Amino acid sequence: MHSRNRRQFLAGLPAIGLIAAHATEDQPLEHIIFGSCLDTHEHPMLDRTLTLPRDLFVFMGDNIYADKGGIPMMQEKYALLKSSRFFQGLKNKPILATWDDHDFGQNDGGADCPIKKEAQVEFWNWLDEPADSPRRKQEGVYHAQSFGPAGKRVQVILLDTRCFRSPMKKVTKDKAMLGGTSVPTDDESTTILGAEQWNWLKNVLKEPANLRIVVSSIQFAPEAHGGECWANFPHEKRRMLSLLQGHTAIVLSGDRHWCEFSRDGVFDFTSSSMTQKHPRGTPTTNKHRIVPKTYHLPNVGHLHIDWAASAIAVNVIGEDGEAKIEQRVSFTKLQIR
């Protein structure tokens, strides 16, 4: 097997290490809890999360904040998270994770991050990935895991939006938007995922699944807000939508420290932050927002799969355990056309 094809194959192997715990092909997934932006390990929202119905938990990035202290701080923060009551309470069910900039090692970082290789080692150490795991040998933390039997199979695809990402196009501060100075580029030689990860994704999408959940640390649907999002690389966004054509899929994203539900070719449900409230309390402009309400206090997302009705319900859950944003979507509407 060609070395590139072999790496693509290995990245799609069934999970091993901690993230394999309790995974089964026989039991269909019904309840997925997901969250991002975890800056403390003791918080009422984390306690509430452990009480929610859960077949799988997904960390969507910024799982620690260690972009200013190098590898020693990263090791310390991962150790604190790993020993926390919250993380220990999650381990009775499968856990999946990807990273964003603050656990990658550089704020808004991309391919030029000087400690990305060392950060990847610490990421897999946190998840107890075995020393001989194929995932430790590839560049980037992208991977996929399938759950459930034929007819009720869910494929969770965790993207790495950091390791290969080209520098973002920036404007001066006097031209900044509410969310920052990042703007779309027209340079189609730039990338978010990189050639290797794109090739891997193409192959992973050939695997059988009734529902595909694509986890992106940054938002996919929203655009023109000045912060990090797929719309800053419009050719990459178009490429993703093209690859997803014909699939029943939803994107889960984090990063923004608020929650919203958007659609631009594919549904994008953003849940952020698990432990922080947004200081401004108002979102940036998003013409693709399909639910007017947004939520800016600590939260997690809950995706419930109703197999009998061929539909999903996605909710933002607050500290009180109540749903703050709710939306039900049929599998038919989730099909990318």
Q: Regions from the language model: what does each represent?
A:
Residues 6, 16, 22-337:
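Metal-dependent phosphoester/phosphodiester hydrolase catalytic core
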Residues 1-4, 11-18:
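N-terminal secretory signal peptides
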